[in-house]
Amino acid sequence: MSERTAYVERNTLETQVKVTINLDGTGKARFAIGVPFLEHMLDQIARHGLIDLDIECNGDLHIDDHHTVEDVGITLGQAFAKAIGDKKGMTRYGHAYVPLDEALSRVVIDFSGRPGLTMHVPYTRAVVGKFDVDLFQEFFQGFVNHALVTLHIDNLRGTNTHHQIETVFKAFGRALRMAIELDPRMAGQMPSTKGCL
């Protein structure tokens, strides 16, 4: 099996982002982003997706977190697209339900080649610590647009905003893990009746 790894750098006047990813990892993670709550959520992707992630970002945090959060999502999406390659032998679809106390979220993903995000998370607070929770929409939109995936995110219940968000990211990690899994029965085959994705 060839290694499914990628390194992507993205530099703008607002941020400089570096992402290293191993899709067949063990869940190791290292972050130097400067947004602790985002780093905590990215750790859920690595741990529950069994994906090794190393992300550095030098962003304009003196303004706010917006550009950093969005650009990390964009660059992570680019890294996924690069690491996955031609998608042959890949399961393609993934889904997961994850609870955390009173909160429950569902995430469904399709590495379809068609970017689309449908996200319904009725946050009970606008801010967790100092983090504006609306920025997670920007993170996932950036990821979707550049990983070229269809992604459905639904928080089905929850009263604690931290729990709502954490269940989303844990479910996202587990859905990714399912979707990127290589199926030996599909070795060398495209997971589509069209023959391409």
Swiss-Prot record:
EC category: lyase
Principal location: cytoplasm
Family annotation (InterPro entries): IGPD_sf (IPR038494), ImidazoleglycerolP_deHydtase (IPR000807), ImidazoleglycerP_deHydtase_CS (IPR020565), Ribosomal_Su5_D2-typ_SF (IPR020568)
Name of the protein in its database record: Imidazoleglycerol-phosphate dehydratase
GO biological process: L-histidine biosynthetic process
Cellular localization per UniProt: Cytoplasm
Catalytic activity: D-erythro-1-(imidazol-4-yl)glycerol 3-phosphate = 3-(imidazol-4-yl)-2-oxopropyl phosphate + H2O
GO CC annotations on file: cytoplasm
Pathway: Amino-acid biosynthesis; L-histidine biosynthesis; L-histidine from 5-phospho-alpha-D-ribose 1-diphosphate: step 6/9
EC code: 4.2.1.19
Keyword annotations from UniProtKB, A to Z: Amino-acid biosynthesis, Cytoplasm, Histidine biosynthesis, Lyase
Family, per entry: Belongs to the imidazoleglycerol-phosphate dehydratase family.
Keyword Amino-acid biosynthesis: yes
Organism whose genome encodes this protein: Stutzerimonas stutzeri (strain A1501) (Pseudomonas stutzeri)
Molecular function as annotated in GO: imidazoleglycerol-phosphate dehydratase activity
One Pfam family cited in the UniProt record for this chain: IGPD
